[in-house]
Amino acid sequence: MAECVVHDWQGKEAGKASLELKVSKETTAVDLMHRAVLRQQAHSRQGTASTLTRAEVRGGGRKPYKQKGTGRARQGTIRTPLRPGGGIIFGPKPRTYNLAMNRKERRLALRTALMARIEDVIVVKDFGNSLKVPKTREISDALIRLGLAADAKVLIILSTPSEIIRRSVRNLEKVKLIAADQLNVFDLLHANSLVLSEEALAKIQEVYGDD
């Protein structure tokens, strides 16, 4: 079980919170998280790259020059892969890049990644509840009050982000906002710091704490 300090919106300490999740063994943790990240990145690929072979290129019914008498190598079509405008040899075709990974492994990788970053977790009480209108400056000032550098990559995890907070965060280049049910290994490992609301922490414990 790990304990986190809870801060209020002004950055002052307001209590403690705990998180208890089962994680992978040290000997397999890195490999497990690596496979989870590879799977996530592979699933984000569209796989729509496509080229034409010499059989599919339009035209190509005539020879570029006569068979004999030129001193050059013989060629039978203007759509050979050796000529500009010709087909592509072994070019890409639409395909799926999806990688298989068991559900238990995926959930274990997620729990392991989160617990590996527990020292970088900052829990905030009533995150952004005082905002009445979207205001980017309020979010950036709050992150500074929490001790985060202005150029730090921050992942904010909320239970159900409001539209006001979404619009306040979207103009901050280094800050990413996700809901607790959008938790993923890549974002957890990519960020320098993780900012969670109390509700998001409780939801994560509820969803992943029973495994």
UniProtKB/Swiss-Prot annotation:
<dbReference type="GO" id="GO:0005840">
    <property type="term" value="C:ribosome"/>
</dbReference>
<dbReference type="InterPro" id="IPR013005">
    <property type="entry name" value="Ribosomal_uL4-like"/>
</dbReference>
<feature type="compositionally biased region" description="Polar residues">
    <location>
        <begin position="41"/>
        <end position="53"/>
    </location>
</feature>
<keyword id="KW-0687">Ribonucleoprotein</keyword>
<dbReference type="GO" id="GO:0019843">
    <property type="term" value="F:rRNA binding"/>
</dbReference>
<feature type="compositionally biased region" description="Basic residues">
    <location>
        <begin position="60"/>
        <end position="71"/>
    </location>
</feature>
<keyword id="KW-0694">RNA-binding</keyword>
<dbReference type="GO" id="GO:0003735">
    <property type="term" value="F:structural constituent of ribosome"/>
</dbReference>
<keyword id="KW-0699">rRNA-binding</keyword>
<comment type="function">
    <text>Forms part of the polypeptide exit tunnel.</text>
</comment>
<dbReference type="InterPro" id="IPR023574">
    <property type="entry name" value="Ribosomal_uL4_dom_sf"/>
</dbReference>
<protein>
    <recommendedName>
        <fullName>Large ribosomal subunit protein uL4</fullName>
    </recommendedName>
</protein>
<feature type="region of interest" description="Disordered">
    <location>
        <begin position="41"/>
        <end position="78"/>
    </location>
</feature>
<comment type="similarity">
    <text>Belongs to the universal ribosomal protein uL4 family.</text>
</comment>
<dbReference type="Pfam" id="PF00573">
    <property type="entry name" value="Ribosomal_L4"/>
</dbReference>
<dbReference type="GO" id="GO:0006412">
    <property type="term" value="P:translation"/>
</dbReference>
<comment type="function">
    <text>One of the primary rRNA binding proteins, this protein initially binds near the 5'-end of the 23S rRNA. It is important during the early stages of 50S assembly. It makes multiple contacts with different domains of the 23S rRNA in the assembled 50S subunit and ribosome.</text>
</comment>
<dbReference type="InterPro" id="IPR002136">
    <property type="entry name" value="Ribosomal_uL4"/>
</dbReference>
<keyword id="KW-0689">Ribosomal protein</keyword>
<comment type="subunit">
    <text>Part of the 50S ribosomal subunit.</text>
</comment>
<dbReference type="GO" id="GO:1990904">
    <property type="term" value="C:ribonucleoprotein complex"/>
</dbReference>
